[in-house]
Amino acid sequence: MSTSTLSDGSLDEGTFAAEDVSGVIEDYFFEGAEKLLEIWFDKNQNGATSLRNIPYSELVSMLDIAQCRILHSKSNECMDSYVLSESSMFISDFRIILKTCGTTRLLHAIERILHIAKIYCNMDNVVSVFYSRKNFMHPEKQPYPHSSFETEVDYLEEHFAGGSAYCIGPQRQDRWFLYTMVTPQAVFPFPEHTLEILMNGLPEDVLSTFSPNVSKDGKDCRMKSAINTILPPDIVVHEELFSPCGYSLNGLIPHSDHYITIHVTPEPDFSYVSFETNQHTLNLCEQMLKVLEIFKPSKFLLTIFTNELSNEGKKMQKNLWDLKICGCRRTNLQFLELPTETLIYVQFERIKSAEQVTCKEVFDR
């Protein structure tokens, strides 16, 4: 096991990852890894209302710029959830989360987001920004500015001043990119944490479930894949089983702005699954292990952001730091201290001699 250092040096990811997909048919490829943008606005700004006041038609126009569209939505008293043609969007009073896969142009939507927040919500003071993604298998297929993290950072800096950019992971292996901007006005007086699991190299018997040939609809897919076992019992879900294959699920925890989102790219040559949540209902450690047991990835990375007020998040960070998984070896472990949060980042890969990824926790729950 080697632990590489966190670096904000070279941000060019190159095309090295394409070596892992030599069997891909050249005229068909889909980039499952998402671009993830989270923007917090100042809730104390004079006259500020709610981002949920933005008209639906304006959201549609904004997503047109990003080159994706809304398939369906659900709401509770705290948040609106949207399953998109390429991943997800969540909007609460002062935060928007936009997560898009494929060759979407997510960062091009920033200017429109800022514009409609000002027009419809009287908000023009951004207090916190997070943008992150895993390295792409084929960055050369991405539109500007997404073909390299360096150009993405330049683009972000055109809209948000004073940010920091990080590249975490070995130069010639899977890596994770993070851009953050936090102002002194960014105060979060409540427990906050976010867990993300990004998985590659899934077995074909797992992947086959996420197709209309095996599952008749999203609910059937959720039950056959056992995804239902990793969801809180009172969660409100909406989901999409795509044709010819693929799956997305958003879930809202009642009476809160907590969510779960899952996205599956099931083509064997470039399989990818993401799981993300900020839920406080279930034990995060147990949930993480169930996710890994369901999808059985050959490679995966985990991140957990937490602030000082989240005991569950801090506990999860400690557990990730000490985590050992039977059948896997840890290839990277990092800690990053940010102005309002801390981050633990860890990567694992399956040991080739192991028949499957068997997840056994060796830490206290």
UniProtKB/Swiss-Prot annotation:
Assembly notes: Heterotetramer of two alpha and two beta chains.
Cofactor note: Binds 1 pyruvoyl group covalently per subunit.
Cofactor(s) in the UniProt record: pyruvate
Pfam families, alphabetized: SAM_decarbox
GO (cellular component) term, any one: cytosol
Enzyme category, top tier: lyase
Keywords linked to the UniProt accession: Autocatalytic cleavage, Decarboxylase, Lyase, Polyamine biosynthesis, Pyruvate, S-adenosyl-L-methionine, Schiff base, Spermidine biosynthesis, Zymogen
Documented EC number(s): 4.1.1.50
Active-site residues, as the UniProt record annotates them: E31, E34, S87 (schiff-base intermediate with substrate), C101 (proton donor), S248 (proton acceptor), H263 (proton acceptor)
Marked site (Cleavage (non-hydrolytic)) residue numbers: E86, S87
Gene Ontology terms describing biological process: spermidine biosynthetic process; spermine biosynthetic process
Catalytic activity, reaction form: S-adenosyl-L-methionine + H(+) = S-adenosyl 3-(methylsulfanyl)propylamine + CO2
Pathway, per record: Amine and polyamine biosynthesis; S-adenosylmethioninamine biosynthesis; S-adenosylmethioninamine from S-adenosyl-L-methionine: step 1/1
Gene Ontology terms for molecular function: adenosylmethionine decarboxylase activity
Assigned protein family: Belongs to the eukaryotic AdoMetDC family.
Record-given protein name: S-adenosylmethionine decarboxylase proenzyme
Modified-residue entries (Pyruvic acid (Ser)), positions: S87
Post-translational modification remark: Is synthesized initially as an inactive proenzyme. Formation of the active enzyme involves a self-maturation process in which the active site pyruvoyl group is generated from an internal serine residue via an autocatalytic post-translational modification. Two non-identical subunits are generated from the proenzyme in this reaction, and the pyruvate is formed at the N-terminus of the alpha chain, which is derived from the carboxyl end of the proenzyme.
